[in-house]
Amino acid sequence: LTSFSSFFPKIFLGGILFFLKRWPPFKAIKGNFNSLVLQSVPEEWENYEIILGEEININKWKLSKIIKRGYKVLLRNPLAFKKKNQNIKLNFEVFHGIGNLDKAINLLDDSEREDFRSFTLLKSSYNRQNMFICRSTKLMDSYFRSIFPWLERCEKIFGFDLHGYGKTRIYGFLAERYMAYWFNKYSKPFTWPIFFFDTSKNW
C-alpha cells in the first residue's frame, strides 16, 4: 500500500484498509476469504483520484416485490413501475418513505439541488455501499463540506425517532445516493467490484 497510501493523511488509512478487504479482484467467491483480499493496489487504480464500488441496478422490479413493498407508491401512481420510471427516486420512496427524498433534496445547497434531483430522476443505478477511496485530500474535503452540513439540515426534518430498517438508517441511504452523484459530477471515478463477506457462511 506504500505508493497509494502516500497520498493520504494517516487518519484515513484505517478506512482504506477496511475497504480493501472487501473489494476483491472479481465478483464471485471462488476460494477462501484470504484469496479475495487485495494484497496490493491494482495497477488500474493509478490514474484515478476516486475509486467507487460498482453500480447496482435498481430497475428490475419483480411483481412480488412491488406488491409487498411498493403498493403505496403504486396506489398513488399506477404508472410508477413502468420501466422508464424505475429510477433512484422510485427505489428510495419504496424503501425509505414517500416524499422523503424530495424533502432532503430541498435542503441541499443551490449549487447541487437541481443537479442531484435530476440524477435521482434520470438514473436507474448508483455506486453502492457508501464506499470510496480518494487520493485527493482537496476533493475529499470538498465532498465532506458538501454532504455533512446537508445531513445536519436533514436531521432537523427527520430527527432520530425513526422506526424500521429503511427509515432508521435514512441518513446513510441519503449519503449513499449523494456520494454516487457528487463524485461522478466532480471527478472521473474508477469502479471496482464489491462482495459481501457472510461470517455465517464464509469462515
Regions found by a protein language model. Give the residues of each.
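ER/Golgi luminal nucleotide-sugar-dependent glycosyltransferases, focusing on the catalytic module
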Residues: 1-203
